[in-house]
């Protein structure tokens, strides 16, 4: 029985190792004609001696390179799946710190450090509140953070909006399961808070999602066009407990200044004039 097992090992090695024309025999075993290292071993088990084929030095290097490339490809595909399943706005998939036109600002630097220190950030449950006028880069930076954390840490991130959350809750049977998913994902980013419907049902669902996130002790990033004053003292009292919870969970960052959208539109118009007039 042992002899049969040994023979099977030898047969398997023979089928898995390629013998090249340049390979040669020396001291009773096969050597690689390229790197001149053994391609065959001698093993004695009991009364049985076998000479299974082995990977030579260059063969081992080629195998390790192939395995590394395979793992890198698998990781790349996994990251792509995470990004496409978690980031629900196609435009945000393209956001990257590499194309940030204001990398020197303290806000941009802080967001980069947020990613750099993600493991500690997640452990300490540190969220961000990005507020300011329209077109100042809030959604862009939210997308940058999401893409970078997914790519660097292979960590699931969900980037969504209140309207999307409400639509999903309306369309799914297992509402508790959906809310649980939003509560448990390592990082949840809610874009454009304050742009949602103001029905009692909508506000109750918004509070439930944010409160469940709070109870789960997971970081939350929120972007909004509202001012910090409007968040602290909302004109509609129904919003107060929602905004209070967000302020409690998130460190505020004011993204003010010239609208990036306006700046890009002007630059595009100038380029068009050069081409058309």
Question: Residues of each region from the PLM?
Answer:
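Short glycine-rich substrate-engagement loop in P-loop NTPases that contacts/grips substrate
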Residues: 103-115, 131, 146-187, 196-204
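A short, basic N-terminal segment
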Residues: 1-106, 257, 265-277
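Conserved catalytic network of the ASCE P-loop NTPase/AAA+ motor domain
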Residues: 120-122, 151-152, 180-182, 211-216, ...
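Walker B catalytic acidic pair
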Residues: 192-193
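Structural motif
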Residues: 187-189, 221
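Walker A/P-loop nucleotide-binding motif
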Residues: 122-143
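P-loop NTPase catalytic core of nucleic-acid-dependent motor ATPases
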Residues: 94, 98, 105-128
């Amino acid at each position: 029985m042992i002899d049969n097992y040994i023979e099977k090992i030898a047969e398997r090695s023979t089928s898995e190792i390629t013998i090249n024309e340049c390979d040669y025999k020396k001291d009773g075993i096969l050597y690689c004609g390229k790197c001149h290292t053994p391609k065959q071993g001698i093993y004695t088990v009991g009364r049985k001696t076998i000479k299974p084929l082995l990977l030579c030095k260059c063969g081992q290097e080629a195998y390790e390179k192939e395995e590394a490339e395979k793992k890198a490809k698998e990781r790349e595909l996994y990251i792509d799946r995470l990004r496409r399943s978690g980031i629900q706005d196609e435009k945000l998939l393209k956001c990257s710190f590499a194309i940030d036109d204001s990398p020197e600002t303290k806000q941009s630097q802080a967001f980069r450090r947020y990613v750099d220190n993600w493991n500690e950030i997640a452990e300490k449950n540190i969220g961000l509140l990005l507020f300011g006028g329209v077109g100042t880069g809030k959604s862009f930076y939210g997308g940058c953070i999401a893409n970078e954390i997914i790519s660097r840490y292979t960590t699931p991130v969900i980037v969504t909006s209140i309207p999307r959350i409400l639509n999903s809750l309306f369309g799914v049977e297992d509402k508790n399961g959906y809310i649980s998913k939003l509560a448990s994902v390592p990082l949840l980013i809610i874009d454009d808070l304050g742009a949602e419907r103001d029905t009692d049902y909508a506000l109750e669902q918004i509070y439930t999602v944010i409160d469940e996130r709070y109870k789960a002790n997971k970081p939350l990033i929120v972007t909004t066009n509202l001012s910090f004053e409007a968040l602290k003292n909302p004109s509609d009292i129904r919003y107060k407990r929602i905004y209070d919870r967000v302020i409690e969970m998130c460190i505020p960052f004011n993204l003010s200044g010239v609208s990036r959208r306006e700046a890009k539109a002007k630059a595009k118009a100038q380029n068009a004039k050069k081409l058309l007039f």
